[in-house]
From Swiss-Prot:
Pfam families for this protein: Ribosomal_L13
One GO cellular component term noted in the UniProt record for this chain: cytosolic large ribosomal subunit
Lineage: Bacteria, Pseudomonadati, Pseudomonadota, Alphaproteobacteria, Rickettsiales
Classification via InterPro entries: Ribosomal_uL13, Ribosomal_uL13_bac-type, Ribosomal_uL13_sf
Gene name of this polypeptide: rplM
Protein purpose: This protein is one of the early assembly proteins of the 50S ribosomal subunit, although it is not seen to bind rRNA by itself. It is important during the early stages of 50S assembly.
GO biological process: negative regulation of translation; translation
Organism, as annotated: Wolbachia sp. subsp. Drosophila simulans (strain wRi)
Database matches in CDD domains: Ribosomal_L13 (cd00392)
Protein name: Large ribosomal subunit protein uL13
Family in the record: Belongs to the universal ribosomal protein uL13 family.
Subunit structure: Part of the 50S ribosomal subunit.
Key words of the record: Ribonucleoprotein, Ribosomal protein
């Protein structure tokens, strides 16, 4: 029996929408990373972008477990000497772009490389309850009902 490899024409991408209100960030990010990679599909092929498109709404209403909201630190460097910047999830969620918390979590759960960057482009995160992808007729996923620990 030969090993099955998915061809470009055989890829069938679906659209999913997830309401992130009250959901735990890490659990949501792990689930979304699996959807973006396509690991939930039987025809998964590592070298092809066979994952689905995911829309996340209400990104500003996510939760962290424990004291991570205040104690977790995100680092970034400006490229200049002494340019190490620190911020907390609380600052980001109360700032101008609260959807970046989920974007960073999902991006860091994907592998590195050009394929991961292409897969990450299939993620659409919105801080409000509205999104502009109604034409794709996304399928709603009730992530909170999958496990009691998913919602806080």
């Amino acid at each position: 029996m030969k090993t099955f490899f998915l061809k470009e024409k055989q890829i069938n991408k679906k659209w999913f929408v997830i309401d992130a209100e009250g959901l735990v960030v890490g659990r949501l990010a792990a689930f979304v990373a699996t959807l973006l990679r396509g690991k939930h599909k039987p025809e998964y092929t590592p070298h092809m972008d066979c994952g689905d498109n995911v829309i996340i709404i209400n990104a500003e209403k996510v939760h962290f477990t424990g004291k991570k909201l205040k104690d977790k630190i995100y680092y970034k460097h400006t490229g200049y000497s002494g340019g190490l910047k620190k911020t907390t999830p609380d600052n980001i969620l109360n700032g101008k772009f609260p959807e970046r918390v989920i974007e960073m979590a999902v991006k860091r759960m994907l592998d590195d490389g050009p394929m991961a960057r292409r897969r990450f482009e299939n993620l659409y995160v919105y801080s409000g309850s509205e999104h502009k992808h109604q034409g794709q007729q996304p399928e709603k996923i009730d992530f909170a009902s999958l496990n009691r620990k998913n919602k806080k």
